C-alpha cells in the first residue's frame, strides 16, 4: 500500500487538495444517480434479471420518474446490470401430407383492432432431466396475451385441444380466427371438429415458416431466453410449475412488451377496454 503523499506526488496533485476532495459531499447529480441506480436495481431484480434499458426506462416512466433512456443505459452499465438476449426457437412441427390444411385467412397480417379477433397457436418443447415436455399455446394477436396453454409429454392432438379449450373457456369469443401452421395436430379431424362446434375459424400458414407465425415465435424466444436458458429442471413437475409462474405470474400480468407501448398484455387489454367504454355514447333515455 502506497503512502498518500507518494500517490499525490505521482499524480501531481497536492495532499491538501486530496484531503479536501475526500471531505467534499457528493454532488447533487451523483446523489441523484445513486438513488436512480438503486431504483433500477430493484426493478431489475423484480424482472428476474431479464429487463434491459428500454423496459427499465418504461418502469421508471410509469412511476413518474422522468429520465432519459441513454442515462438509464449508462447507469446500468456502471452498475453491471444487463438484460437477456433472445435466441431463435426450434420448431416441433410435423406436417401430415395427406391432410387438407385450412386456408390462410391471415396472410401475415397480424394487425387487428381488438382482442379475440385473431389467435395464433404453436408448440415448442421444454427440456428437463426427466425427458421433454411439450408446450402448446394460444396467443391473442392484439395484446400478445397467452389466452390458452397446455403441457404434455406427447405431441398428440389432445395437447392443442387442451390449449384451445382453455382459451375458449376464458374468452368466449365470437368468430375468432385461430391461425397455426400445418402441423398434424392442427390438421387433425378432432381439432377441425372442435373449431366448427365452437365457432372458431381455422387458418393455417406454411410449416415451420417463422414469418407465418412470428408472434408465437417471438413468445417462445422470450420464454427460452428469460426462463429455459437460465434454469435446468430436474423433474417435469418442476418445469410445469415454472412455466405456469412465467405465463400467469409474470408474462401476462407484468412483463412489458415493446410492441404494446411497453405495457404488459393484461394492462394493454385494460387500456383498450377503458378507451372503448369512454368512447361509447351514453344510453338514450
Q: Where are the language model's segments positioned?
A:
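Charged DNA-binding/catalytic regions of mobile-element recombinases
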Residues: 1-285
Amino acid at each position: 500500500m502506497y503512502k498518500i503523499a507518494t500517490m499525490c506526488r505521482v499524480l501531481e496533485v497536492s495532499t491538501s487538495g486530496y484531503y479536501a476532495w475526500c471531505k467534499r459531499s457528493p454532488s447533487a447529480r451523483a446523489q441523484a444517480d445513486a438513488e436512480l441506480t438503486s431504483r433500477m436495481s430493484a426493478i431489475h431484480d423484480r424482472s428476474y434479471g431479464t429487463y434491459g434499458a428500454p423496459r427499465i426506462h418504461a418502469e421508471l416512466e410509469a412511476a413518474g420518474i422522468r429520465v432519459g433512456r441513454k442515462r438509464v443505459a449508462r447507469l446500468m452499465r456502471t452498475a453491471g446490470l444487463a438484460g437477456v438476449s433472445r435466441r431463435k426457437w426450434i420448431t416441433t412441427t410435423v406436417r401430415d401430407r395427406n391432410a387438407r390444411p385450412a386456408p390462410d385467412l391471415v396472410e401475415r397480417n397480424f394487425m387487428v383492432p381488438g382482442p379475440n379477433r385473431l389467435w395464433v397457436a404453436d408448440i415448442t418443447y421444454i427440456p428437463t432431466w426427466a425427458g421433454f415436455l411439450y408446450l402448446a399455446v394460444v396467443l391473442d394477436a392484439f395484446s400478445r396475451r397467452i389466452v390458452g396453454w397446455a403441457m404434455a409429454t406427447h405431441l398428440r392432438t389432445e395437447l392443442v385441444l387442451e390449449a384451445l379449450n382453455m382459451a375458449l373457456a376464458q374468452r368466449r369469443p365470437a368468430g375468432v380466427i385461430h391461425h397455426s401452421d400445418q402441423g398434424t395436430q392442427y390438421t387433425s379431424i378432432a381439432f377441425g371438429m372442435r373449431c366448427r362446434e365452437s365457432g372458431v375459424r381455422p387458418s393455417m400458414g406454411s410449416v415451420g415458416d417463422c414469418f407465418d407465425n412470428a408472434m408465437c415465435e417471438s413468445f417462445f424466444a422470450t420464454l427460452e431466453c428469460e426462463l429455459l436458458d437460465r434454469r435446468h429442471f430436474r423433474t417435469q413437475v418442476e418445469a410445469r410449475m415454472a412455466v405456469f409462474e412465467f405465463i400467469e405470474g409474470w408474462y401476462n400480468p407484468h412483463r412489458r412488451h415493446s410492441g404494446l407501448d411497453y405495457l404488459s398484455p393484461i394492462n394493454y387489454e385494460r387500456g383498450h377496454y377503458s378507451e372503448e367504454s369512454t368512447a361509447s355514447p351514453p344510453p338514450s333515455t
